[in-house]
Amino acid sequence: VSYSFNSDLANGSESRSGNGSISELYLGGAWSPVKGLSVGANFSYMFGTLEHSTAIVGTSTSVFYRMMEVRDWNVHIGAQYAIDINRKNRVVLGATYTPKKTFRGNTIGTFYDAANDTKIDTAFQCNMKGNYEQPNTYGVGISYNHGTKLFAEVDFTYQDWANAKYTPMTGFEPVKVKFDNRWKVSGGLQFIPDDRGNYLKRINYRLGAFYNHDYLNVLGNNVRDYGVTCGFGFPALGSKSLVNLGFEWKHRVSSPTCL
């Protein structure tokens, strides 16, 4: 989570920001029942903290702060099927699914009124189980290989956040907190001129792009971001390792109002 928005009010302004992440430790396995087909699953333990704050500045200043501590398990399942067109050309189709589930952990809300020099007070606290949910997540992708020279891939991910349960904090948020369904499409390719040629021809050249419709809905505005990436994989002298260098340009916008 990483965002920051500002909007004008009749007698002041409102700013919202958030940061944090949820990490996962994985244990996975896979099985190939028939040639070309692979199925597998990852079981993981999730842990991390998400922080959100809202500051209202006017004749007085009030700060609302929410922290969510997640400690939970998760499961991801997937399958892929490889089609060998000939000796050099291969197409791989893949799909993934992460089921909807309730989060386990705790959430705490605090409030501070600068005008009255109010002490920071815990105004809301609850167990996340049964109050906050992770949505269903679906993913599909297709990739193409031409020997070791060319690799290209396109992926699509969809999460139905609009149907995920989210219990608002009393006094902190509207009775109904709205999320948008999230979807993202991304693609990339890697090109190696000649993996047996001179040094410049053995460099990995990479290019990609993405478009993301986020689940955030801020004051009725949809949030989305898009960007391009490029990178290089430089062969390390005397070994088969690569030294990777990458760049990314990203732009985040909201509509219909620019925040």
Regions found by a protein language model. Name each.
Residues 1-259:
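Outer-membrane beta-barrel porins/channels
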